[in-house]
Amino acid sequence: MRTSYLLLFTLCLLLSEMASGDNFLTGLGHRSDHYNCVRSGGQCLYSACPIYTRIQGTCYHGKAKCCK
């Protein structure tokens, strides 16, 4: 009986850490901004976009530009 309480307690601690973390469950199924940029035909660049292209979004969590 004591062991089952201990297991239940550790399970609750683990689940509470996951919930307060990086929103593990809401992050499932979301694509990275780099993936979305390349999938739409763009390219991720840290420098300015080349001539005849424009900024369509960001890549690498806002550190680079998605040029298309």
Swiss-Prot record:
One of its GO terms (biological process) is antimicrobial humoral immune response mediated by antimicrobial peptide. Keywords: Antibiotic, Antimicrobial, Defensin, Disulfide bond, Membrane, Secreted, Signal. It comes from the Eukaryota. Residues 1-21 form the signal peptide. One of its GO terms (cellular component) is sperm midpiece. GO terms for molecular function: CCR6 chemokine receptor binding; identical protein binding. Its main location: secreted. InterPro entries: Defensin_beta-like. Residues 22-32 form a propeptide. It is found in: Secreted; Membrane. Disulfide bonds join C37-C66, C44-C59, C49-C67. Coiled coil: none annotated. It holds the Pfam family Defensin_beta. Belongs to the beta-defensin family. Has bactericidal activity. May act as a ligand for C-C chemokine receptor CCR6. Positively regulates the sperm motility and bactericidal activity in a CCR6-dependent manner. Binds to CCR6 and triggers Ca2+ mobilization in the sperm which is important for its motility. Monomer. Homodimer. This is Beta-defensin 1. It comes from Macaca mulatta (Rhesus macaque). The lineage of its organism: Eukaryota, Metazoa, Chordata, Craniata, Vertebrata.
